[in-house]
Amino acid sequence: MNSDANVDLTEIAKFEAIASRWWDMEGEFKPLHQINPVRLDWITDKSGGLFGKRILDIGCGGGILSESMARRGAHVTGIDMGKEPLGVARLHALEQGVELQYQQMTAEEHASQTPDQYDVVTCMEMLEHVPDPASVLRAIATLVRPGGRVFISTINRNPKAYLMMIIGAEYLMKMVPKGTHDHKKFITPAELCRMGEAAGLLVRDMSGVHYAPLSNQFKLGKNVDVNYMVEFIRPEHG
C-alpha cells in the first residue's frame, strides 16, 4: 500500500476486528442492515433505476449496499481498504449467487486507473473515517462519468450528533461498538457541499436519515442534524 494513501489504519483495524459478523442482522452491523433499504430506494429513485448501470461503491465494507444494488441489476464494483471485510463480502456474494466485483484499493488509486467509468458512485458512512475526505471527493469526481450521479452519506458535526451517535448509539443503546465514531471527524452538510463543488460536482439534493425507536426503523426527512445523504451530479460539460 502506498504510504501516502488516504487511509487511517486505526479506522481500518476497527472494522477488521468485527468483519466476520458483518452479515449478522442482530450484531454490530444491525443499523447498517436497517438503514440499507432506505438508502437503496433513495439511490434507485434518484438514479432513475439501477438496472444495467455501472456503479462503484466506495468503502463497501462487507458488501451490504453493494450486493443489494447488484440484486437490482447493476454492474457493481465495491472497493475498500479492509482485507477482512472484503473477504466476507466476496464469500457472502458467492453463497448468495450475486455477481459483482470487489477490490482492495483506495478511491484515489481507483480513479487513477478508471476515470469517467461509472454511471453512479456511492460512498456511505466512509468519509468520516479517512484523513482527507476532500481527496475522496476529487477522486469521485474523476471516477463518475459526465452526467453521472454521486451519493454520499455521512454524519453532521454538532452537539446533537455527538449526543445521538456517540453517547446514545455507542454507550447507551449499544447499537454500534464503542469507539466507532470520532466527533471531530464528522462533516457538516456545508463542508461536504463545498468539497463536492471544489471537485467539480454540483449538489442536486439532500436528505436527512432518521431512526424511529418506536418502530425500530429508519426513514428519510428534511432534518439533516445528524445522519444525512447528499446527491451530486457531474456536469455534462465544463
From Swiss-Prot:
S-adenosyl-L-methionine binds at R39, G59, D80, M124. This is Ubiquinone biosynthesis O-methyltransferase. Keywords: Methyltransferase, S-adenosyl-L-methionine, Transferase, Ubiquinone biosynthesis. Coiled coil: none annotated. It catalyses: a 3-demethylubiquinol + S-adenosyl-L-methionine = a ubiquinol + S-adenosyl-L-homocysteine + H(+); a 3-(all-trans-polyprenyl)benzene-1,2-diol + S-adenosyl-L-methionine = a 2-methoxy-6-(all-trans-polyprenyl)phenol + S-adenosyl-L-homocysteine + H(+). Its EC number is 2.1.1.222, 2.1.1.64. O-methyltransferase that catalyzes the 2 O-methylation steps in the ubiquinone biosynthetic pathway. It is an enzyme of class 2 (transferase). Belongs to the methyltransferase superfamily. UbiG/COQ3 family. It comes from Aeromonas salmonicida (strain A449). Pathway: Cofactor biosynthesis; ubiquinone biosynthesis. Disulfide bonds: none annotated. GO terms for molecular function: 2-polyprenyl-6-hydroxyphenol methylase activity; 3-demethylubiquinol 3-O-methyltransferase activity; polyprenyldihydroxybenzoate methyltransferase activity. GO terms for biological process: methylation.
